[in-house]
Amino acid sequence: MYNFVKIFRSNFIDINAANKLEIFLKTILRIYKTPARTHLLAHAADISAIYAVREIYNYMKNDEEGRIILKEKPLLIRQDIQFNELKKLPKNTLGYKYMEFLETYKLHAHDREVSHFFTDLNYSYILTRYRQIHDIGHVVYNLNISIESEAALKVIELVQTKLPITALAILIAPLMTPLYRFQYIFKDSIPSNFLTPNFDYTYNDAYNYVDELSIKQYEYNLTDYFHVDKRDDQKFYSKMYQYYLDNINNSSAVRGSIIYGFENKSNNDIIYDHPNREYIFLKNLKKKHLLFQYKPRKNLLRELYPWAYMAGVSTTKPLHSIHIEKWLDKDIDLFRRTYNISPLPDHLNLMAGIN
């Protein structure tokens, strides 16, 4: 409680309704152009959330656990949570999985924007808590941070919170989601001259692809959904990152990722989803590599949105009204069973799950 009172006082911005409307309109126009600037989304949520937050407050006020949360105002910040201790917990606990998610995607609970425009302490806390619990949602529903996974989580949050900004995100997300995505996965390391003019894009055993075709047969940008854990070549990474920044909003472009240090242990050579014609897995048993390709936008509309809606409806209690802090040292599967949380189905895991 004491920590949030200090945070509230230092972050409150006192402006009139006309100024709020101006900020809302400006942020909405800029969100589509620069979706990576999450503070814009936060400001728009602040200004548009009053009625939804009031309903959340009334729900929590009439719920025993909710009343405790409103009274104590716990926060997922270092003053309240010993994050390093969470990494020492058993691997299937909620706290360990939470830290694993944050470190995998280079995130931190402190990155979540504090509510700025509510004059009411409780309302400000509720919206701030909703943002902090967002990453817990990723963990318990097993969703990564791709555009389509974020959009699916927004469906769950819309069901649980009725926040207008979640509906806006759901409507815009398909336009921002790439039409096609693939991943080339290397066995040991990315070739040092990859993405340079002298790189041989035709098949070459030295580069350990699974794909026997020329990479030049694809028109693509290496953007949006990349994951590089071992960056031996800093020039490669900076070039990859620049591609990401330049093309983040190019929804019609084909996007891909390069991963290495991966070993495909599946026994199947080819898996093809005939009903949806969505994706295909090609594996080379000798080299143990994988080429994975699918259509994110189609997948979002046909599979992720329907699953997310049902997952949101079936969950017996909104995440923001659960005392998450008391569950961090508990088994994540027990948490899911307790609140009837349905994580991402297995067949969607490679496309949208935490890997």
Swiss-Prot record:
Gene Ontology annotations of biological process type: ubiquinone biosynthetic process
Subcellular location: Mitochondrion inner membrane
Domain of life of the source: Eukaryota
Required cofactor names: Zn(2+)
Quaternary structure annotation from Swiss-Prot or TrEMBL: Component of a multi-subunit COQ enzyme complex.
PANTHER family: UBIQUINONE BIOSYNTHESIS PROTEIN (PTHR12922), UBIQUINONE BIOSYNTHESIS PROTEIN COQ4 HOMOLOG, MITOCHONDRIAL (PTHR12922:SF7)
Official protein name in the record: Ubiquinone biosynthesis protein COQ4 homolog, mitochondrial
Organism: Plasmodium knowlesi (strain H)
UniProt lineage: Eukaryota, Sar, Alveolata, Apicomplexa, Aconoidasida
